[in-house]
């Protein structure tokens, strides 16, 4: 079995593959203060709850945008599983030509998503990943990674609105029934949601025009992908496990 780990600023998503099939997945909070032992115990408990024999895991791959957490997980895997972790980095075989000056300048999660989406559609594509930041990545018709854009995440924008104002309350984010809010909370929810749908569609449309590609498939992933996709004119599909799929593909290309 293959254990894949995607470390983001807010969450860590773990997946366990049997061959090409995702057998189990978990989402846990990213906590920079946790030690390798704490992550090791947490991992052991997750496996035990699914009645997974840890001795059946023979490979581990990790992509992390939070270096201290990535390092703690590497130590946890070494101590509790007796395995060395393949860490996504600049020296890997991505199977994608890179047009940027150096792959080290691109977040590991973004390259992993690019690998997964091109394997999926085999032509020009845009990946929109809704996380603490929302990333937009363009892959060309020949699988060339062309770059992208980074915007503040929707929850990050919500937090900033609450923290930087004196009277606006903290609100729960869900699909608003109307654009014209009748209360302060409704108005905030409407502005954040519909404003963000406009941001997403606007960036995608500009990337389409700037790239000149006639046919671009747009895949969304990340925690808020389904929420925004329901009103987006540009998102073609939502793939919650896109990053995990990319990690599996990278492991297979680099083992």
Curated annotation (Swiss-Prot):
Tell me how the cofactor is bound. A monovalent cation. Ammonium or potassium.
Q: Where does ATP bind?
A: 6-13, 132
Which pathway does the protein contribute to?
Cofactor biosynthesis; coenzyme A biosynthesis; CoA from (R)-pantothenate: step 1/5
Gene Ontology annotations for the cellular component aspect, listed alphabetically: cytoplasm
Q: What is the lineage of its organism?
A: Bacteria, Pseudomonadati, Pseudomonadota, Alphaproteobacteria, Magnetococcales
Name of the featured protein:
Type III pantothenate kinase
- Name the Gene Ontology molecular function terms of this record: ATP binding; metal ion binding; pantothenate kinase activity
Q: Where does K(+) bind?
A: 129
Write down the EC number. 2.7.1.33
The alphabetized UniProt keywords are:
ATP-binding, Coenzyme A biosynthesis, Cytoplasm, Kinase, Metal-binding, Nucleotide-binding, Potassium, Transferase
Q: Required cofactors, per record?
A: NH4(+); K(+)
Catalytic activities: (R)-pantothenate + ATP = (R)-4'-phosphopantothenate + ADP + H(+)
